[in-house]
């Protein structure tokens, strides 16, 4: 156990363009959202909640003794959904809340703990996670979100663009096929810790222009002057489920695990 009091909220939106009813995806006999909650329990969080906009998701969670509550269906982001949870639950302003994505059934409990600890230790408004990018294809992939950090470890900017840009290296004929030595390129992992007081404020913030164009909700906080502290981990965490191909891969993994029991 971590020794730090914090809560985990798992936003579980039912609708998904690429994977409808994603939270209910069967993984070895249990819905994916329940698998995520089981991993979160191992972090030692004092409360775990599934926040959903669909009665079937709530019923599935509660059938496996996972607390769930209904939230509005019109939230623009997962952070907006968490703000509603804070309001519904009446949590005190200094409560630490970790936002664990509902499509991460293999999330490492230690990373959840690290993120909560980083928020508590840094005094920042938000804590999140990143790891080094070692593959040029990932660096230039707009689906891989990059973060540039300041000297104090806070985020300076997040982008889908290749940042920072090694001008001289990439100007070479084959420069785009490799990354320079000691290149400070980091991939952002979508795990966040906040205080309830921040989430209450976030709900009233005007969306940022950069948030709209990059389609990155964390840019709203940066635009309004909030601090985001970044914990660097050595390697990429286990992959989540974003596509039908991911879903099939994850099903097979859990089926194999069940067969070995």
Curated annotation (Swiss-Prot):
It holds the Pfam family CTP_transf_3. GO terms for cellular component: cytosol. Pathway: Nucleotide-sugar biosynthesis; CMP-3-deoxy-D-manno-octulosonate biosynthesis; CMP-3-deoxy-D-manno-octulosonate from 3-deoxy-D-manno-octulosonate and CTP: step 1/1; Bacterial outer membrane biogenesis; lipopolysaccharide biosynthesis. GO terms for molecular function: 3-deoxy-manno-octulosonate cytidylyltransferase activity. CDD domains: CMP-KDO-Synthetase. Keywords: Cytoplasm, Lipopolysaccharide biosynthesis, Nucleotidyltransferase, Transferase. It is found in: Cytoplasm. Belongs to the KdsB family. This is 3-deoxy-manno-octulosonate cytidylyltransferase. The gene is kdsB.
């Amino acid at each position: 156990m971590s020794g730090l009091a914090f809560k985990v909220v798992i936003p579980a939106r039912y609708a998904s363009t690429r994977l409808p009813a994603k939270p209910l995806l069967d993984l070895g006999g249990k819905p994916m959202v329940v698998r995520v909650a089981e991993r979160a329990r191992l972090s030692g969080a004092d409360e775990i909640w599934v926040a959903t906009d669909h009665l079937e998701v709530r019923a599935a969670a509660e059938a496996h003794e996972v607390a769930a509550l209904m939230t509005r269906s019109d939230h623009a982001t997962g952070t907006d959904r968490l703000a509603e949870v804070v309001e519904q639950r009446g949590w005190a302003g200094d409560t630490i809340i970790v936002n664990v994505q509902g499509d991460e059934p293999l999330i490492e409990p230690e990373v959840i703990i690290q993120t909560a600890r980083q928020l508590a230790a840094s005094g920042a408004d938000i804590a999140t996670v990143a790891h080094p990018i070692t593959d040029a294809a990932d660096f230039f992939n707009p689906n891989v979100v990059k973060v540039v950090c300041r000297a104090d470890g806070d985020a300076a900017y997040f982008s889908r663009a290749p940042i920072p840009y090694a001008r001289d290296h990439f100007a070479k004929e084959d420069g785009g096929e490799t990354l320079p030595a000691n290149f400070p390129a980091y991939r952002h992992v979508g795990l966040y810790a906040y205080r309830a007081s921040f989430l209450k404020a976030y709900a009233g913030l005007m969306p940022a222009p950069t948030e709209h164009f990059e389609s990155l909700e964390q840019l709203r906080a940066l635009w309004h002057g909030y601090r985001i502290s970044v914990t660097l981990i050595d390697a990429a965490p286990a992959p989540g489920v974003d596509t039908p191909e991911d879903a099939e891969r994850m099903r097979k993994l859990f089926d194999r695990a069940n067969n070995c029991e």
